[in-house]
């Protein structure tokens, strides 16, 4: 190695300092993963070289046989990992080994709690990559040269994992990257061939690149010549190309950790080879937990794309719809050309066919998980349910299938847990019920005792309780399931159809006619605040409620639009009253018109509060209520 030139000392990005500190302390109990992370990076470097060499074969520099080599020195207490992949230029070294260029990094770091066990899961999810070397090393040296640059443009990066790192230009004859870990005191166990072999077999057997270690000689062979003999210690074949029957669950799980940069096992996976008009292999995984950036729409998503086993790109998001953005995995096609680009992917009809088939495969996989492992599906729903709810709006062709995977809280369920499927609901419907009833609101606590549910409780009719911010928007696209229409119990003029007897309907009409005078007085008192006043069929215990017009926006949608700064169309509620309630009877008998108006406004404001809405004039409400209390106490 020649003399170093252009040497400079630079500081780590603030987030890197935080991550290094947290990682070294949180991941210490699982320290052997440093090797998996470094091998994974080396594998990616080889993939990138293969891809770039499609257009520029000269990048291979006459060495097309790509491999990873692991060596160690017990006396020097070092472990060295070397690859002959794409390598890095000086600028790339500073960018990749000094900063974290991930969206949502700051948010991620805020979520760390200081609880080592919880933080280790989060950090593992984030993908620690190269920085994991500092779990076992107190100094790391990186020697690298990018393919296509001259031998004089090699780079030496060095750091003790504290606040700064050094970068210098050096001579490096071979392209690729060599990482030298100077092991901390107490970590000498890793400078051992048997230990390194075991870690490679455990975590990286599936890597398609040969991983070589020096051959160890025993007995009489121990005094063999000093020339190193290398032997491959992993299978070195792309896991997805092997027959399913030959792949163990543990191998699938380790491969998932490699492609997803996750520490935890996936919930389930699907490995499938398609032959015929289209030819491709897919290996798709459902993660066990949501990534920290699930709701960052610009966050990387999509599958690893290979064409004829040659890596083409990461995060190919054209193969699955956005509502399945949490799915990880690989797709390897024989039908695409090796020079395929993102622009081509967006226009190729072959991609549309593959997207349709892969989407169906994921939905089938989720159906199977829900049927065979309901407890694991509960974990899936908790992590990804709100994202899956985007499906009916995005994917008309699979709307019914997605609807079958949705889960809700319900008046027949246990608390606020979203565990009721639409099939469960339909299995419990009453004779003559041809609708699926639901109610939306801000929280389970707010809507579980809503006056809108009173008649349903009286008649023993189950109502789904929808409290996620996305729910009202979801229901604007999900209008029916299995031939039965969805009905919002807080919207329009409630008609229970055959669930109301002819006698009930006749009695309702008679009461409405009898209360025409009261209806007119209430309209006069409420004026422009309401669209309509009518006798309610919904109430059994409460005096009044506010219903939403059939075409009007509900509270959830109004709040979403307001939060995003959009203009909210003006709408007025429908005031419904319970004619048999003592307060309404008292109101009907009130001769003093001023007091009638005050009482009416109190009832209106109480109905607004019960619906989860805020009062336009809280001070006027308090004033009227205090006035009433004074009169009652006199």
Swiss-Prot record:
Q: Describe the function of this protein.
A: Molecular chaperone. Has ATPase activity.
B: annotated segments? 343-559
Similarity-based family: Belongs to the heat shock protein 90 family.
Location in the cell reads: Cytoplasm
Q: Where is this region: A?
A: 1-342
Alphabetized InterPro entries for the sequence:
HATPase_C_sf, Heat_shock_protein_90_CS, HSP90_C, Hsp90_fam, Hsp90_N, Ribosomal_Su5_D2-typ_SF
Q: Which Pfam families match?
A: HATPase_c_3, HSP90
Q: Which GO terms describe its molecular function?
A: ATP binding; ATP hydrolysis activity; ATP-dependent protein folding chaperone; unfolded protein binding
Chief subcellular site? cytoplasm
Q: How does it assemble?
A: Homodimer.
Location of region: C: 560-634
GO cellular component terms, semicolon-separated? cytoplasm
The lineage, from the top, is:
Bacteria, Pseudomonadati, Pseudomonadota, Gammaproteobacteria, Pseudomonadales
- Stated name of the protein: Chaperone protein HtpG
Q: Does the keyword Cytoplasm apply?
A: yes
Which keywords annotate this record?
A: ATP-binding, Chaperone, Cytoplasm, Nucleotide-binding, Stress response
Glycoprotein in keyword set: no
| Organism for this UniProt entry | Ectopseudomonas mendocina (strain ymp)
